[in-house]
Amino acid sequence: MANGVIPPPGGASPLPQVRVPLEEPPLSPDVEEEDDDLGKTLAVSRFGDLISKPPAWDPEKPSRSYSERDFEFHRHTSHHTHHPLSARLPPPHKLRRLPPTSARHTRRKRKKEKTSAPPSEETPPIQEEGGAGVEEEEEEEEEEEGESEAEPVEPPPSGTPQKAKFSIGSDEDDSPGLPGRAAVTKPLPSVGPQTDKSPQHSSSSPSPRAQASRLAGEKSRPWSPSASYDLRERLCPGSALGNSGGPEQQVPTDEAEAQMLGSADLDDMKSHRLEDNPGVRRHLVKKPSRTQGGRGSPSGLAPILRRKKKKKKLDRRPHEVFVELNELMLDRSQEPHWRETARWIKFEEDVEEETERWGKPHVASLSFRSLLELRRTIAHGAALLDLEQTTLPGIAHLVVETMIVSDQIRPEDRASVLRTLLLKHSHPNDDKDSGFFPRNPSSSSMNSVLGNHHPTPSHGPDGAVPTMADDLGEPAPLWPHDPDAKEKPLHMPGGDGHRGKSLKLLEKIPEDAEATVVLVGCVPFLEQPAAAFVRLNEAVLLESVLEVPVPVCFLFVMLGPSHTSTDYHELGRSIATLMSDKLFHEAAYQADDRQDLLSAISEFLDGSIVIPPSEVEGRDLLRSVAAFQRELLRKRREREQTKVEMTTRGGYTAPGKELSLELGGSEATPEDDPLLRTGSVFGGLVRDVRRRYPHYPSDLRDALHSQCVAAVLFIYFAALSPAITFGGLLGEKTEGLMGVSELIVSTAVLGVLFSLLGAQPLLVVGFSGPLLVFEEAFFKFCRAQDLEYLTGRVWVGLWLVVFVLALVAAEGSFLVRYISPFTQEIFAFLISLIFIYETFYKLYKVFTEHPLLPFYPPEGALEGSLDAGLEPNGSALPPTEGPPSPRNQPNTALLSLILMLGTFFIAFFLRKFRNSRFLGGKARRIIGDFGIPISILVMVLVDYSITDTYTQKLTVPTGLSVTPPDKRSWFIPPLGSARPFPPWMMVAAAVPALLVLILIFMETQITALIVSQKARRLLKGSGFHLDLLLIGSLGGLCGLFGLPWLTAATVRSVTHVNALTVMRTAIAPGDKPQIQEVREQRVTGVLIASLVGLSIVMGAVLRRIPLAVLFGIFLYMGVTSLSGIQLSQRLLLILMPAKHHPEQPYVTKVKTWRMHLFICIQLGCIALLWVVKSTAASLAFPFLLLLTVPLRHCLLPRLFQDRELQALDSEDAEPNFDEDGQDEYNELHMPV
């Protein structure tokens, strides 16, 4: 190099501009003589001779003619690129002398010993890039990096040649030229003649024009080796590049190029290299040293590996997002500040201006114009990706400088824009949380802030061009009417920044979320809008900016004048909504340049809907929007799935598998299916034991939580109420042979055993309506055949055990897959109708026994009848015991009607209250879940307060005793008690055993199937074969002790699982609730069954319950179960016009008359079952119910298409865990 000038490290930055006066200073004689020699060599006449005398033409070689257009095309191609000659020099930090240390001194001494001959004093050695000197410097830098940065560089003694260095600030000392580069420059003419000449200098003399340019640059700038060079002087706005008019000319300051190139080449270079591209990352590529070893050389790889270790890997993994929109507003004292107006976790929440409270979450609706303006803003604004800043002032400083360079704002607006970005932030919750000490963070004046981030270099008296920091001066007023703008409270880090944070909001934000801050507003000092999109290199916590302490990764700034047509609020909502979109914010994390962001906006527009500007009255007009949006989302998911398939096609992952896992699906293998047949005897049972019993220790540990205690209390009342209700009704059906005490004991014993040994201990074992119907039918059959009812139940139980063992051995539980909602709806509808019918039938019997008469018998006769029909405890005796019950009692029928309807309406109202808007969600759930016990307690108190009216009470024995102690005991003899049991009935008992097995199989397996849904996230698995074996085997034992058969109660089991479900708290407002975990354990089931068993000691309290209250509970169970069946909903559509039909798949995808045909088939099956149940063959109704399964799979496919059957008979109901959602009765198709 001729001058030894070292370019700055940012090689991609624009070259600095040097104002060269037209007047050239006089040159020395030596310089003129050297320029004459070079001018003769490169004279224009010499090139003219070469052009005028072309070489001899060879006809054998192909040739073509070149025109002026070809030369012009060559100048503008990529091959016509001029690299500065000074780019071959090492970086400036490699040329700085480090302070001497003992280790470095030892290495240098060792190196001098290996050198053969020292360099000459007259000719300094040339330091070649990649040579030994550079390698030594690299090693020293790698080992003593921190030491060299911390210790100041001591200047060498005067008189020794030094390396030229660049200075970032203006406080560096002047340094002489660079040794070893022949960089001994000529001083100015006023200094004196040149005294030192080197051979290298004489061999490469510059031209007079370049020499004049160099000398002029030394006058006008601190460019000469005797002055420090400031990199900030090279930074200039793009508008200054086109300033070619005037008496001065702009040329590059690279002296090597100025000496070697002509004016035409310099003009061409300016068009390519003197322009600035804001927001584009320039990566410095260092050429490897020629003296380094090869790839296999450890010495050559060691520095590279050390360098790679020091570089921190960027985390471009997409995180959950939290977006906050802040707008520039004026407070009551007319001072500007940033005010939070909206936020996004998934949906938009706006701050209501009048009440200063948050509105309901909703889907953000954007204008199409704002999206187009946002796209144009990002295309022409500043884009700073991977910005390495950790404070808001540092970020704001770089944003403002980038805006100036990209010609968005003027340099004189720097202070105002920076002051605007650093204003304080306020949030709607600040006033609520601040209390007596409101938050008012302030900082020092603007001068100190700008002084920290804009150090002003000291310029000499040589008239150098000032840098950007010189343009700040005194801060101008931010607002024209506010003269005290310098004292505005600014945002500064530190202090109690998040004192007003909302802990409730923080719980709804995911733990790994990163925030996006959107700042928009109008300012009076700008002439055009200015915008910047910033992505930080690493998410940082900016104090007092956000409402909650969430690290910030993205910032979007948009400032502009108010007289433009830009709606800054809508533009801020647009970028905030884009950042809350899943696909766009993933693209923002992985974007490498501006074009990636624009492509993501286009992808967002492809999935958006434009609503025409027409008045919309009513929600019915917007029904098609939701369907169209679902179709667009489906296509969008298909495109994403296609991308996943393309990326995983060459790997081991199946296509679409990763997408399903991301969407929340589970990777289920065929071995995990509990209903999969193994082909071996008891193979399914063995798999259930191996799957579930290893979790037995955790089933005990997981119960150590307060939520399990609350679930025990709640499910206890939920299980006790049906036990009392069905016990009282069972005593009525069996004439007192089995009643409340037997059902309570059976529920307790079987519940404890099943909870300890079952594969799914969350199932609640209890009595159900179908079993009550079967018990009534079997009792009538035994009375008709003059058989002992309890002895017949013993043989039915023994055959039940045999059939259950055979079914489990054959792995017959897989048959539950064939029981579709078609059969479940028929089953549930039939049982609900039976409940409702039995309730009003019992009420009719009460009105028959106690009619409303105009005259009643005398009071003495009434008391005598009462004394004859009542026991000392006031309970009514069974019809078969003693004298008949009292009849013709006044007001008994009316009071029974009031008690029944009162119980029904209280329980039904509390159930509706659970899904209302009053109180909080937890309070409503507690009141709704205890609706049945509350209604029973209220009506019992009403009956207890009315002392002069007779009502029939519940029959409960004293202590642990059977209901009729004089008729039976706790053990039932299999051969008969009063008379021998006929042998033919011992064999014929297999038929009712098979029928009761159908009921137990359907209820138990369907309940287990509902509980084991993937949406409920049970992790320990289930066992259909083991559960069926336990319930069937324990049912056989119940027959020996005269206890009722039990099954898995659907509603109580689902309620038990819901009570043990833990919901995620980090759910965006308005989003669907999600399950975090379910506390799967065995202790709650054991405690619930034990408490139900201990309730037998409350005989005195239970004997106060009127039977009319139990009839009200019976009516409640029938009505609520009927309301949740889809068949009843479709049945109402027959009486409804087609225009009022709901938007359901069975309405939109099936013709109306074919839907009614499907309903008629189901109603025909229900009518047939009702007829069978009402005749002497009522015992066979489970068999007819089972026939609906082949009817669905064999006959209906001939009448309906698969598409129609999928819409009419599909199990698409998912559990609803919303506090304001539906309860268990509306989710299930099973009877109570």
Curated annotation (Swiss-Prot):
Residues 134-152 have a biased composition (Acidic residues). Residues 1-708, 911-925 are cytoplasmic. The modification Phosphoserine is found at S167, S170, S175, S198. Residues 440-450 have a biased composition (Polar residues). Residues 1-316, 429-498 are annotated as: Disordered. Residues 709-1232 are annotated as: Membrane (anion exchange). Residues 200-214 have a biased composition (Low complexity). Its main location: membrane. A lipid is attached at C1165 (S-palmitoyl cysteine). The lineage of its organism: Eukaryota, Metazoa, Chordata, Craniata, Vertebrata. Residues 1-11 have a biased composition (Pro residues). This is Anion exchange protein 3. The chain crosses the membrane at residues 709-731, 737-774, 794-816, 826-847, 893-910, 926-946, 980-1002, 1028-1049, 1083-1128, 1155-1191. PROSITE patterns: ANION_EXCHANGER_1, ANION_EXCHANGER_2. GO terms for biological process: pH reduction; regulation of cardiac muscle cell action potential; regulation of intracellular pH. Belongs to the anion exchanger (TC 2.A.31) family. It comes from Pongo abelii. It is a multi-pass membrane protein. Keywords: Anion exchange, Antiport, Cell membrane, Ion transport, Lipoprotein, Membrane, Methylation, Palmitate, Phosphoprotein, Transmembrane, Transmembrane helix, Transport. It is found in: Cell membrane.
